[in-house]
Structures are given as structure tokens and as C-alpha cells.
């Protein structure tokens, strides 16, 4: 869901924030929160995926893709779709899982990754920067990288189901339960030409 990004951008003083999410559950959650806020806020969520957005829209100052890239069967197509949403000079903020390695390295799990069945590609940072340049982005750069910790992502009284600790090798938290490198998240910025 894109809830937190929509609200944080409103608090940063943006004039209009539009999120997209193909999951009805997250759209309804957003609408409930907006309704209880009790005032008209310049933020909305459309119940669609990026593939349903108009092609070559070139309308947005900033586009966020947070935790989406590794769920896409074609990361190159996703990067192109993101670029085509941005106005000239607009900024992409992309957060995704990465693996260590030189340019050209990408983990393509044959089965699950951290118990997730829908993880297709985990590039190295240099590989993702190369993909961004190939898709026409200017000045792509990584601005943060960190290994996800079990203190950050954990079960709580409010979230009682499985969490990161259940997805990691119990004897070696540097690996997933399947033996892959543990989740490392990186944030990238780039501009549309």
C-alpha cells in the first residue's frame, strides 16, 4: 500500500498527491483514514496499477516506487513506466531490495525469497544504476543502503503474524530461510530527461 507516502507528502506541503494501488484493501484503508481526517485533503488513491496509467503522461514532479521493483517480472519495463510518468526534470525516488555484486549481478530466485513467491529480480546497486541509465534517467544515484533488521521489522501486539525473523535462517540471519542473502534495502534517486 502507498498510505504512508501519500500522507507524508501532504505534511511536506505538496499541493496535490495522487497514489495508485491495485489492491482494494489498501485503497479502502486509505479512504477510511481520509474520511476520519474530517477535512478535504488534496490526496487521493486511484485503484489501479502502474500499467493502467496513461502512457507517456509526463505529468508528475516526483514519483515514488517503494518496494515494487523486485515484484515486477520486467524491471526494465517498470523503470520505463516510471520515467514516462515524470515531467521533464521530475524526480524518481525508488526503494528496492538489492544484493551485493558488481554491475551485471542480479539474483533471480527460482523459488521463494524470504518466503515471498513473487520476487523476480534483486539487482546489485551498480546493476540497478545501469538499468536506470539505460532507461533514460539522468544522474541516477544510490542515497541509502541498509540491511533490514529484525528490530525494525517484527511482530507486535498489533501485527501478530510472521515477520522478518521467520523469513531468515534461524542459525544465520545473514541469509533467508531459502539460503539467499538477507534483505538489504537501497534508495535511489534520478531525474527524467
Language model region names:
Residues 98-119, 132:
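Short, glycine-/aromatic-enriched active-site segment of Class I SAM-dependent methyltransferases
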Residues 23-25:
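Conserved SAM/SAH-binding beta-strand->alpha-helix loop
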Residues 60-75:
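A short SAM/SAH-binding and catalytic strip from SAM-dependent methyltransferases
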Residues 38-52:
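Conserved SAM-binding strand-loop segment of SAM-dependent methyltransferases
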Residues 138-167:
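Conserved catalytic loop of SAM-dependent methyltransferase domains
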Residues 48-63:
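A short acidic, Gly/Pro-enriched loop at the edge of an enzyme's catalytic core
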Residues 76-91:
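A short glycine-rich, Lys/Arg-flanked "PGG" loop and its adjoining helix->strand segment in the class I
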Residues 119-142:
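Short alpha-helix
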Amino acid at each position: 500500500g502507498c498510505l504512508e507516502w501519500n500522507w507524508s507528502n501532504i505534511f511536506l506541503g505538496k499541493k496535490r498527491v495522487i497514489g495508485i494501488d491495485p489492491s482494494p484493501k489498501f485503497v479502502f484503508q486509505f479512504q477510511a483514514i481520509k474520511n476520519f481526517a474530517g477535512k478535504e485533503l488534496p490526496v487521493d488513491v486511484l485503484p489501479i496499477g502502474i500499467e493502467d496509467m496513461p502512457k507517456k503522461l509526463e505529468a508528475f514532479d516526483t514519483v515514488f516506487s517503494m518496494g515494487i521493483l523486485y515484484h515486477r517480472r520486467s524491471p526494465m519495463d517498470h523503470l520505463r513506466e516510471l520515467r514516462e510518468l515524470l515531467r521533464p526534470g521530475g524526480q524518481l525516488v525508488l526503494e528496492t531490495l538489492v544484493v551485493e555484486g558488481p554491475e551485471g549481478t542480479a539474483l533471480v530466485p527460482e523459488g521463494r525469497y524470504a518466503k515471498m513467491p513473487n520476487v523476480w529480480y534483486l539487482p546489485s546497486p551498480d546493476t540497478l544504476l545501469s538499468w536506470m541509465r539505460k532507461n533514460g534517467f539522468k544522474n541516477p544515484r544510490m542515497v541509502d543502503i541498509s540491511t533490514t533488521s529484525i528490530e525494525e521489522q517484527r511482530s507486535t501486539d498489533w501485527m501478530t503474524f510472521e515477520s522478518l525473523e521467520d523469513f531468515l535462517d534461524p542459525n544465520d540471519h545473514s541469509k533467508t530461510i531459502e539460503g539467499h542473502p538477507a534483505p538489504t534495502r537501497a534508495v535511489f534517486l534520478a531525474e527524467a530527461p
